Amino acid sequence: MSEMTPREIVHELNRHIIGQDKAKRSVAIALRNRWRRMQLEESLRVEVTPKNILMIGPTGVGKTEIARRLAKLANAPFIKVEATKFTEVGYVGKEVETIIRDLTDVAVKMTHQQAMEKVKFRAEEQAEERVLDALLPPARDAWGQSEQKEDTSNTRQIFRKKLREGQLDDKEIEIDVAAPQMGVEIMAPPGMEEMTNQLQGMFQNLAGDTKKKRKLKIKDAMKALAEEEAAKLVNQEELKESAIFNVENNGIVFIDEIDKICKRGESSGPDVSREGVQRDLLPLIEGSTVSTKHGMVKTDHILFVASGAFQVAKPSDLIPELQGRLPIRVELEALTSNDFKRILTEPKASLTEQYIALMKTESVDVEFTEDGITQIAEAAWTVNETTENIGARRLHTVMERLMDEISYDATEKAGEKFVINAAYVKDRLGDTIEDEDLSRFIL
C-alpha cells in the first residue's frame, strides 16, 4: 500500500492533470487515511470507516483521469467500473456484486506477482540446477542413485559460469516442464460469469499436473523453469488470505457515470438499470459480505469513489440512502482556454510532445510555437462553447485535424521541419471554427 503523503500524491497527480485542485486534495486525503487507519490498534481500526467521495463535473475535465492515475499511485487493489453496465438482481445483466469479485481477482493477481518476486532468486537458483542437470546428467550407480564425482563437479562449475555469462543462451536442451493447461471455453448467460469460472477451474483441475518433454533454448528454458519453481515455493492458501485482507482493508472501487443511473422525471414502470442498481449498490457501500471464488469478502472498509457529469440529472436525484453514503462532494470546474494551453504543454507526455515524437520516427521535425499553442487552445475552447462542451477531449479532435496533412505526407517529407504557429493554425482550422454548422460535424 502507498505511504505517500497527501502533498506528494497531489504533486504526482499535477504531473498528469491540470487544475481540479479540490478533487486532487480529496482523493489524496482519502488515500492517506487508508494508511493512517492501518496504523491504529485493532479495536479502533474496526470502527474507522472510509469517507466515500462523489466527484461532480462536466465531461472531459479529468474525473476518469484522476481515477486512472490514482490506480497507479495507490499500490492497492483498485478497480474502475461503469455504473451503466449493471442491472438489478433478477434481470439479465451483470449484478453489482461482480464489482467485488473482480476487485478480489485483481488483488489475488497483485499478491501473486509480489509473492513470485520474493521467491524469484531461489527459483532462479533451482532452475539453474535443473538446466545443468539437463546439460550434464549425473552419473548413476548400479542401484540407480546419482554419484557426485569430483571431475563432474568441476565441469558443472565451468558450465555454470558459462550459463551465467549467457554463452549458452542459444543452445537447445530437452527438459520436463509442466504441460500447459487446456483452456475450456464455456458460453454462459449474462450474470453467471462466476459459475462459469468455477466450472472452468474444475475442468482444468481434472487434468492434473502433467509433465511434458519440450525442446527449448536455454534462455527460454531458464524462464519457464524459474516460473515453475517459483509457483512451487508460493503457498496458494496464504496468498488468497493475504489478497482478501488487502481487498477488505485497502481496496478502492471507482464507479464512473453514476449520474446515468439516476431516475429522471416522473416515469412509471420498472427502472431496471437505474434505481434498482442504486439500491443494489447500497449494501456494498454500507458494508456486506460477498461470496467470491477465493473466499468471503467484507466490504465495510472498501473505499468507493463515484463520479458523474450530472448534466441532465442532479446529485439530489440519487436515492437519499445512496447520497448519505457518499458524504464527501467535490465539484470539478469546466476547463478554460488557459487550462487547454497548459494541458497542451505541461503534463508529462503532453499532446504536443506525443505528436513531435511520432513525427520524429519519420525524420520530420515539428515545432509548436507559443502563439501556435495559444491559438490551438482558443480554437478548442471556441468549438466547445459554440457546440457541445466535451472538455479536454476536444483537443484530440482539433490536434488530429491540425496535424492531418503533416501526418499524411510525413513519409515523403523526411528531413523537413514544420513550424506550427498561429498563422498555420488559422489556415488549417479558421474556416471550420467560424462555420458553426461545419464545426458540429468535423470538430
Curated annotation (Swiss-Prot):
ATP binds at residues 18, 60-65, 256, 321, 393. SMART domains: AAA (SM00382), ClpB_D2-small (SM01086). SUPFAM superfamilies: P-loop containing nucleoside triphosphate hydrolases. One of its GO terms (molecular function) is ATP binding. One of its GO terms (cellular component) is HslUV protease complex. It is found in: Cytoplasm. GO terms for biological process: protein unfolding; proteolysis involved in protein catabolic process. It holds the Pfam family AAA_2. Gene3D superfamilies: 1.10.8.60, P-loop containing nucleotide triphosphate hydrolases. It comes from the Bacteria. ATPase subunit of a proteasome-like degradation complex; this subunit has chaperone activity. The binding of ATP and its subsequent hydrolysis by HslU are essential for unfolding of protein substrates subsequently hydrolyzed by HslV. HslU recognizes the N-terminal part of its protein substrates and unfolds these before they are guided to HslV for hydrolysis. Belongs to the ClpX chaperone family. HslU subfamily. A double ring-shaped homohexamer of HslV is capped on each side by a ring-shaped HslU homohexamer. The assembly of the HslU/HslV complex is dependent on binding of ATP. This is ATP-dependent protease ATPase subunit HslU.
